[in-house]
Structures are given as structure tokens and as C-alpha cells.
């Protein structure tokens, strides 16, 4: 029928769950500011009060909700498209993942997400990215050690963020680089640290830094190496 939306509110509401997002390869982005960052038109937009009551992922809807196709790339595509990558290993908080994506966008990097990390398309991840999900290449569901082997073979330096390491962010090399960051508390497993050539710590008065803060510091340091 003419005028029938391509994606109904009922179908869109199912995209709040990972199961249905994966089945449809679609996700939700919410709010005018985030939708305004999208370089592609959404497949469907919901804006009426009744539609938002069904589709919004928030108790108090913050604006229109758009439906978009998945954006992630393969590991090979990621490594071919950027010179700096942050690998998030086992970072399960979607807010941290989204904020790290935002930092990667700011500093011209890409993001690699290991298996067990927060879902790239979780509404909280999308929201925390503040639209950077549309501008940042992200590969997901990766085996970290396998990804590092591929990155090393492609000429990337491999750095592990380890709290007790003697190296500091200022010692990061220039050139192509993968920075590996684990979850706050558990950190990186030994096999990931062993796969890296460099270990760097971040001097701090706090016992630990969350993953997104660590990512921001290290990505800035790597970015500053290529500034004129």
C-alpha cells in the first residue's frame, strides 16, 4: 500500500534486542543530534509521540529514532583504512565502548572489538558514541590474538596497555599502531600481552582508569606523533 512504512514500529521495536538486530542486520539510533551525524539516510524514521513510545530505547524519548543498516567492517578492511587502531578486549560496558569510538573518531583511528566486548549496536553504545559510530571504522567479534597477528603482518606496531609497565604513553612509536586495552579491573589476558611488542602504562594517582579514558589518552598520544 502506498504510504505504508518500509519498517513498522513493531518491527523496529524488536531491534532493541541483539537477537533481532543480528537477524535483521539493522540497528536503532536515537536523537536529532545523532541522526544529524549520519552520512546516510535512515531506512525509516519514527518521530510521533505514539511511535516513540514503542520504538524509543529511553524512558523519556530524546527525539526521533532512525533505523540504519549495520556499519561494521572486516578486520582486513579496518587495517587497510586507518593507521591507528584501538583494540578493546573484553570491555563489556557499552558506554565505555561508545566513548572509545568517539575518541577514535576524534583522533583518526579505528576500533576493533573482541568477542565478549559490548555489542557495537547496543543502544547505549550508539548513544555514547554521539554519532561517531557513523564515521569510525569498527570491526567486531574478533579473536584478539588472531587480529594482532594479522595487524602485525600488515606492518602495524602492537602495544598493550598494562598498568605496571615501565613505558609511558610518550614512548609510543609513530607509524601504524594497534593499542590494546582491557576492561578496568581485569585488564588484558597474558596471551594478548605476549602478542604485543610494546607495553605501556599510564601514570595515575587513581588505582585504575576505565577503558574509554585509557583509550582516549593513548589514541591522543599516537595521534600527536603525526601532527605537523
PLM features per residue range, with description:
Residues 66, 103-109, 117-134, 189-228:
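Structured adenosyl-cofactor binding patch, chiefly the S-adenosyl-L-methionine
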Residues 31, 92-100, 208-214:
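Amphipathic alpha-helical repeat scaffolds
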Residues 156-206, 211:
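Active-site/ligand-binding-proximal alpha/beta "capping" segment
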Residues 72-73, 77-161:
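RNA substrate-binding interface of SAM-dependent RNA methyltransferases
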Residues 47-75:
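Glycine/small-residue-rich loop that forms an oxyanion/phosphate-binding "nest" at active or ligand-binding sites
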Residues 1-46, 117-119:
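Boundary-proximal intrinsically disordered activation/regulatory segments immediately upstream
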Residues 26-34, 42-47, 138-140, 154-159, ...:
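Short, hydrophobic beta-strand segments that form beta-sheet elements in well-ordered domains
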Residues 27, 89-90, 114-115, 140, ...:
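Glycine- and other small-residue-rich loops at beta-strand/loop junctions that grip anionic moieties
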Amino acid at each position: 500500500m502506498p504510504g505504508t512504512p518500509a519498517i513498522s514500529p513493531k518491527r523496529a521495536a524488536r531491534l532493541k534486542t541483539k537477537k533481532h538486530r543480528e537477524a535483521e542486520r539493522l540497528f536503532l539510533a536515537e536523537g536529532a543530534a545523532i541522526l544529524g551525524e549520519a552520512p546516510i539516510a535512515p531506512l525509516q524514521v519514527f518521530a510521533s509521540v505514539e511511535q516513540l513510545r514503542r520504538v524509543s530505547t529511553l524512558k523519556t524519548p530524546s527525539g526521533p529514532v532512525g533505523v540504519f543498516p549495520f556499519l561494521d567492517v572486516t578486520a582486513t578492511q579496518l587495517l587497510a583504512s586507518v593507521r591507528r587502531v584501538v583494540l578493546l578486549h573484553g570491555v563489556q560496558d557499552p558506554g565505555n565502548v561508545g566513548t572509545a569510538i568517539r575518541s577514535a573518531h576524534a583522533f583518526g583511528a579505528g576500533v576493533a572489538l573482541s568477542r565478549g566486548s559490548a555489542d557495537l549496536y547496543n543502544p547505549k553504545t550508539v548513544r555514547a558514541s554521539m554519532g561517531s559510530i557513523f564515521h569510525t571504522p569498527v570491526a567486531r567479534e574478533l579473536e584478539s590474538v588472531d587480529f594482532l597477528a594479522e595487524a602485525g603482518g600488515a606492518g602495524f606496531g602492537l602495544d598493550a596497555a598494562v598498568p605496571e609497565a615501565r613505558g609511558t604513553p610518550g614512548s609510543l612509536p609513530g607509524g601504524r599502531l594497534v593499542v590494546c586495552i582491557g576492561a578496568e579491573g581485569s585488564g588484558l589476558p597474558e596471551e594478548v600481552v605476549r602478542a604485543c611488542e610494546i607495553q605501556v602504562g599510564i601514570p595515575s594517582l587513581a588505582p585504575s582508569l576505565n577503558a574509554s579514558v585509557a583509550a582516549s589518552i593513548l589514541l591522543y598520544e599516537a595521534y600527536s606523533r603525526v601532527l605537523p
